[in-house]
Amino acid sequence: MEQTEKSKVYAENGLLEKIKLCLSKKPLPSPTERKKFDHDFAISTSFHGIHNIVQNRSKIRRVLWLVVVLGSVSLVTWQIYIRLLNYFTWPTTTSIEVQYVEKMEFPAVTFCNLNRFQTDAVAKFGVIFFLWHIVSKVLHLQEITANSTGSREATDFAASHQNFSIVEFIRNKGFYLNNSTLLDCEFFGKPCSPKDFAHVFTEYGNCFTFNHGETLQAKRKVSVSGRGLSLLFNVNQEAFTDNPALGFVDAGIIFVIHSPKKVPQFDGLGLLSPVGMHARVTIRQVKTVHQEYPWGECNPNIKLQNFSSYSTSGCLKECKAQHIKKQCGCVPFLLPGYGIECDLQKYFSCVSPVLDHIEFKDLCTVGTHNSSCPVSCEEIEYPATISYSSFPSQKALKYLSKKLNQSRKYIRENLVKIEINYSDLNYKITQQQKAVSVSELLADLGGQLGLFCGASLITIIEIIEYLFTNFYWICIFFLLKISEMTQWTPPPQNHLGNKNRIEEC
């Protein structure tokens, strides 16, 4: 043990000797040399005003210049603090710009019949209304009473018909689009047909999208305002029906206007056109650009697996699909993703409780940067203005009745006319921008330094060099002091003993 302590002492002494030897090669400047170094810095630095403190012979002038320099340093420190404080509040500005163009891309439009099911298919199959109510819960939560008659019937049906595919039923027995339901279609003066529409499932069952991103129509552009898409639908109320008990009491067409790259979102965004009416819709294109965090709330690094472009609605669907797949081992057909399709039994036993859990725990949230689905960094919307007129007129009623070989009452109760066009060939860009960029901040700080102190980046480097040199000399001074103190050795033990004996005498 004693041997170990001795070896440590020898090692420390050896290290100190090495430090002392190294410092002896670079001796500490004398006080005169250090004073000269300080004087040379004061008269040569580009920090204006300091040389006046040193070189002036008058003490009054020296004091005045000292006050001026200290005041300038205080002011520039205050100004820099204010600007840094303002920068780190991440301020933004909003710019609005209107761009006029010769041609504009036409948006996608998704149409659905408010009466979702074929009458003959559901005449003896009334439980399908409640089944679809359960299935479409994945798109937006609905209050479902567990003790209701419809719920019990749906549960019993799901237990006894395990191989039943509600997807195929809706596809085959829901609303369809052909020449009997789409009586007339015209896009920018050219005829179109049901083939130009892409099928899509929504909470309204079978819906059809014109100008879908995967069709050739999506590449067409409108070059004249006031012209666009003109459609004449036959909702055929006798052939299609719905359940008024679930809130479906209207007759007509519901449609939503959206970007061709995005899926339709009806919840709160659908436009209605009732039967016996001509709906004229004028739209504008509005592009909104949001800044990323911390200036804004968007996150440019989020990519969706099943959609080409990011949207909060698409993100919410993927979020729900991931939780359901993890807990239930299947994916609802109304949600994106790959995997086993959830059967009816899974909807009751697993999917519905998981959706309630997602809502209760806020597992899929929208809005801020730290939510599951923050706002889009860039989104395109189509604000619409809609006006109605009675359709058809008395003269047109006679013409259509003869052309379609239908009664006037049938024409009034089943036909819907819809026109969609741009109000102007321009689009508005609303852009959120950084109020202060890094380059602007540096320029502002440099301006403050130059205004109050006549300083620049080179001046700051000079001051840093001066402070570092003095700090280096202070370190050398203390290291030399430490090495001198370690050279002192205590007096031998026998001397202490003799001293004690003398004191005793």
Swiss-Prot record:
Gene Ontology MF: a single term: bile acid-gated sodium channel activity
Residue spans, topological domain Extracellular: 83-459
Position of sequence motif GAS motif: 454-456
Cytoplasmic face residues: 1-61, 481-505
Glycosylation sites: 147, 163, 178-179, 306, 370, 405, 421
Entry-linked InterPro entries: ENaC (IPR001873)
Keywords tagged on the record: Cell membrane, Disulfide bond, Glycoprotein, Ion channel, Ion transport, Membrane, Sodium, Sodium channel, Sodium transport, Transmembrane, Transmembrane helix, Transport
Record's protein name: Bile acid-sensitive ion channel
Annotated source species: Homo sapiens (Human)
Gene expressing this chain: ASIC5
